[in-house]
Amino acid sequence: MSGEQELGITESKEHSPGEWYAEVVQKAGLADYAPMGGFIVTRPRGYAIWERIQNNLDGWFKDTGVQNAYFPLFIPESYLEKEKDVVEGFDPEVAWVTHGGHNELEERLAVRPTSESIIAPFMAQWTRSHRDLPMRLNQWCSVVRWEATETKPFFRTKEFLWQEGHTAHADEDGAWEETMTRLDQYARLYEEVMAMPPLKGRKPPHDKFPGAHTTTTIETLMPDGKTVQAATSHYLGTSFGEAFDITYADADEEENTAHTTSWGLSWRAMGALIMTHSDDQGLVLPPALAPDQVVVVPIWQEDNKDEVIDYAADLAAELDEADVRVELDDREHRNPGFKYNEHELHGVPLRVEIGPHEVEDGEATLVHRPDGETETVDRDGIADTVTDHLDTVHAKLYASAEETLEGEIREAESREEILGTIGQHGGYVKCGWCGDEDCEEPIKDAIAAEIVMVPLDRDEEPIHEDCAICGEDAEETAYFAKSY
């Protein structure tokens, strides 16, 4: 993938979403393919978006007692084998180091697919008393899972960036509260920062994290009707505490096993963001994540060049002073039309156009990236005005995504209805489910759709009395969908 190609998107999001997505990632300067299959190079603009996701979450984590740490990339095989469910769950995806230079290692080292097995032993070492709990650790790192056969930047890569949080608690209540706190923070990220409506739920028992008691999930719907598992938060019970001897002495000096959690969000969130908001003109970004929130474009003739550029520069400086991320595009070798197209391609949420008329009248013309809405406003108070317009851009993006989601949740009462509805429309189909994994198989085999979540509330009544597949009594509501 090379960035030195024709400016502008040539593929259609509606008709060729896969090709369109790859072209947006390429031409908006987000990523390049690495020489090894399944790996990508994240370019500065793409990494800047990830940094803003990271900064928001990192602040919220720290506000709620989390400390950052870093653990080794390599995990001894014996450590990985201590939790048998983790071994069984990840074994096909683990990359192994067998040699150091020309010498064969005494013990194979796994390139971390996830870090429970290397973090838990140290949590055990650092936990002695109930006063040491809760212990809340997080690390920002990359992991490797040798599963991607077709590279799709930010969606399917063998190596990906993420954060993984790991906590230990004295009891189930504390650990479950932690699990839900992190799930709520992920939902907040999608709503307040990414302008995307999240669905919160649980994974069905057969699809929970290996070794977990309960896996909770954030699901987001893509325009092509597929869902993305956008973040997960796991209550691990005492399985890891028992496997790695994470114990503590309570107030009565009785030894107890700690309850643990883990939770994570990867750069798949970036893939979901790009897929949800972007269009046939290129990348569309919510203001909170845009590297440049505003671009100021002066439009001049030779006889008014200095006056127009000075006016635009003063306006840009005022926005910068107000902590708006702003770029002044006063390049002389590019015409205004080229600049407009380029900044639309790069996803800048708001464009400010300054020509001789704006200078003469003490105004500025604002153009919204998502829909091209244009408004001429007073120059006075421009920082407050621009901030209001950025809020409006976020609201537009959220409303559009919410409207799409609401129209893509349907119900079904039979296997045929599930197959027909997803086959025709995509999206989510809710139905009664008996809780048996076998009832998922005919849907998965026929159209590659599966149960992506069930309601968080275990006491919630199922949407229908009978299981849509086998006809037995329904235990809960299942959401079927195709997924990335």
From Swiss-Prot:
Its EC number is 6.1.1.15. SUPFAM superfamilies: C-terminal domain of ProRS, Class II aaRS ABD-related, Class II aaRS and biotin synthetases. One of its GO terms (molecular function) is ATP binding. GO terms for biological process: prolyl-tRNA aminoacylation. It comes from the Archaea. It catalyses: tRNA(Pro) + L-proline + ATP = L-prolyl-tRNA(Pro) + AMP + diphosphate. Consists of three domains: the N-terminal catalytic domain, the anticodon-binding domain and the C-terminal extension. PANTHER family: BIFUNCTIONAL GLUTAMATE_PROLINE--TRNA LIGASE, PROLYL-TRNA SYNTHETASE. Catalyzes the attachment of proline to tRNA(Pro) in a two-step reaction: proline is first activated by ATP to form Pro-AMP and then transferred to the acceptor end of tRNA(Pro). This is Proline--tRNA ligase. The gene is proS.
